[in-house]
C-alpha cells in the first residue's frame, strides 16, 4: 500500500487511491489475506524476542522455538497457497469497494494489531507448554520462565 504502485489485487479491490497513509497501512489488515500476513509477522516477532530474552533451560527454549517455527511454517504455507496477499490483480477495478469504514477511525485501525498481539502471544505460551510436556518438567522454574510471556500476551 505504501509503494503507490497500484498493481496488487488487495489495493485495487479496496480502491485506496485517495486515502491517508495511516488508512492505507490499516488497509493491510483490512482483509483476510492481510490479517494472515500480520498474524505471521507477530508470530515471527514473538519467536525472535523469546529466543533473544529467554536464557534459562536451553532445552525448553529450543523446543519452544521449534514448535513456534512449525506454526510459522504452517501459516506461511497456508498464506502462500490459499490466501496470497501478493497476488497480482487480474481485474481492472475502477474504484474498488473502499476501506472498511471502521478502519478509518484511528483507534479502531490499531485495534486488530493489538488484539493479534494477545492472540498470537498465547501461541508462545502454548509452544512452551508443549515443550514442558515433551521434557516432562513442568515445575516452578517452568512457570517462572513463562510468567512474563503470559503477562505480555494478556
Regions inferred by a protein language model and the residue ranges of each:
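Residues within membrane-spanning alpha-helices of integral membrane proteins
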Residues: 15, 41-44, 66-69, 73-76, ...
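Transmembrane alpha-helix boundary signature
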Residues: 8, 12-14, 49-61, 76-91, ...
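Single conserved hydrophobic/aromatic residue that forms the stacking wall/gate
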Residues: 1-20
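Central hydrophobic cores of alpha-helical transmembrane segments in multi-pass inner-membrane proteins
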Residues: 21-22, 39-54, 125-129
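Membrane-interfacial loop-to-helix junctions in multi-pass inner-membrane proteins
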Residues: 49-73, 134-154
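Short aromatic-rich membrane-water interface segments that cap or initiate transmembrane helices
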Residues: 21-35, 97-117
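Conserved, charged catalytic cores of large soluble enzymes
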Residues: 85, 89-91, 96, 121-143
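Hydrophobic alpha-helical transmembrane segments in multi-pass integral membrane proteins
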Residues: 30-51, 64-69
Amino acid at each position: 500500500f505504501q509503494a503507490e504502485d497500484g498493481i496488487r489485487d488487495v489495493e485495487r479491490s479496496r480502491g485506496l487511491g485517495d486515502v491517508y497513509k495511516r488508512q492505507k497501512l490499516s488497509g493491510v489488515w483490512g482483509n483476510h489475506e492481510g490479517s494472515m500476513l500480520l498474524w505471521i509477522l507477530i508470530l515471527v516477532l514473538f519467536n525472535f524476542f523469546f529466543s533473544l530474552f529467554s536464557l534459562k533451560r536451553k532445552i525448553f527454549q529450543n523446543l519452544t522455538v521449534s514448535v513456534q517455527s512449525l506454526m510459522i511454517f504452517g501459516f506461511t504455507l497456508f498464506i502462500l497457497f490459499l490466501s496470497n496477499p501478493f497476488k497480482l490483480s487480474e481485474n481492472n477495478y475502477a474504484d474498488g469497494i473502499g476501506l472498511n469504514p471502521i478502519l478509518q477511525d484511528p483507534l479502531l485501525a490499531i485495534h486488530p494489531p493489538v488484539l493479534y498481539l494477545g492472540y498470537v502471544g498465547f501461541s508462545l505460551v502454548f509452544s512452551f507448554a508443549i515443550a514442558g510436556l515433551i521434557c516432562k518438567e513442568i515445575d516452578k522454574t517452568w512457570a517462572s520462565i513463562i510468567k512474563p510471556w503470559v503477562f505480555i500476551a494478556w
